[in-house]
Amino acid sequence: MDLSQLRPPEGSRKKRKRIGRGSGSGHGGTSCKGHKGQNARSGGGVRDGFEGGQMPLSRRLPKRGFRSRILKDIVTLNVEKLNGFQTGVEIDEHRLKESGMVKSSAEKIKILGKGEIDHPLTVKIKMISQGAKAKIEAAGGSVIEVV
């Protein structure tokens, strides 16, 4: 047996349906669309969610709240992640984005107190939790809250 004798398994290569090519093709005449009606017309069919005039599910269910366009998502970062920086380094929002710890598109960053930090760092940031601040200062570092 060589490469020229290889064939795909029976039934694995299905022919595509060529509609409107005469009755001999098996898909002629009405082109698999049935007789008349909205779905038989060109561009026919109904939009997503349309239920034939019945009140659609999306309108029957109650709505609650909304997502404010003014508020931006706050990206959180735990103290344990700051161990990746060297001792004595000054960390600000720009450096966090530069290092890849936070996406560059992040508008607000808050440092939280999960985990431990084992060396002193200087952190300049707008938002930081009390626990995170205490842990950084306990490790010999300092926190400068920027306004």
UniProtKB/Swiss-Prot annotation:
Keywords: Ribonucleoprotein, Ribosomal protein, RNA-binding, rRNA-binding
Region described as Disordered: 1-63
Family: Belongs to the universal ribosomal protein uL15 family.
The protein's name in its UniProt record: Large ribosomal subunit protein uL15
Record's compositionally biased regions (Gly residues): 21-31
InterPro entries membership: Ribosomal_uL15 (IPR030878), Ribosomal_uL15/eL18 (IPR021131), Ribosomal_uL15/eL18_sf (IPR036227), Ribosomal_uL15_bac-type (IPR005749), Ribosomal_uL15_CS (IPR001196)
Top-level taxon in the UniProt lineage: Bacteria
Biological processes, Gene Ontology terms: translation
GO molecular-function term, one example from the UniProt record: rRNA binding
SUPFAM superfamilies, A to Z: Ribosomal proteins L15p and L18e
Cellular component GO terms, alphabetical: large ribosomal subunit
Record Pfam families: Ribosomal_L27A (PF00828)
The UniProt record lists the keyword Ribosomal protein: yes
Free-text function comment from the UniProt entry: Binds to the 23S rRNA.
Quaternary organization: Part of the 50S ribosomal subunit.
Organism expressing this protein natively: Syntrophus aciditrophicus (strain SB)
Gene designation per UniProt: rplO
Cystine crosslinks: none
